[in-house]
């Protein structure tokens, strides 16, 4: 997969307007990009720094399409968005991060298994299905655990 350099003055669309979105927007602006943000909270931190703002829920298909149409590239600030909707967005618009990582990040067990398979050092974990598996985790991992 190859990506062309985004020309200065292009518009970056960000799904999510929290603190991370705000920092992303400010960095993009310092590099000469315009920023449009989609967030359900009209008082979100990013709303005050973005060039344009779409006030809509993250799962609003029409709002996501509007963001895709108005931005040269679309990114997201967190994993709490629908991987399926992100997949649909990436099929028609420039979403270089894709949706695959979101799919992994939304299931913490799959996330840990994927990192472990890739050779990353991670803390011990067990899948908790019921009270018995919780007791097993206490015995095998010990306290504290999350």
Predicted regions and their residues:
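Active-site nucleotide/adenylate-binding loops and adjacent lid/helix of ATP-dependent enzymes
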Residues: 104-146
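ATP-binding N-terminal substructure of ATP-dependent carboxylate-amine bond-forming enzymes
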Residues: 1-106, 110, 132
């Amino acid at each position: 997969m190859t990506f062309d350099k985004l020309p200065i003055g292009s518009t970056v669309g960000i799904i999510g307007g929290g603190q991370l979105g705000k920092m992303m927007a400010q960095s993009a602006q310092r590099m000469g990009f315009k920023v449009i943000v989609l967030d359900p909270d009209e008082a979100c931190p990013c709303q005050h720094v973005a060039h344009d703002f779409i006030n809509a829920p993250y799962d609003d298909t029409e709002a996501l399409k509007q963001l895709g149409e108005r931005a040269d590239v679309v990114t997201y600030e967190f994993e709490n968005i629908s991987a399926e909707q992100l997949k649909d967005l990436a099929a028609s618009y420039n979403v270089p991060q894709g949706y695959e990582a979101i799919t992994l990040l939304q299931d913490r067990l799959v996330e840990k298994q994927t990192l472990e398979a890739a050779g990353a050092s991670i803390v011990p974990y067990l899948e908790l299905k019921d009270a018995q598996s919780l007791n097993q985790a206490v015995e095998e991992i010990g306290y504290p655990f999350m």
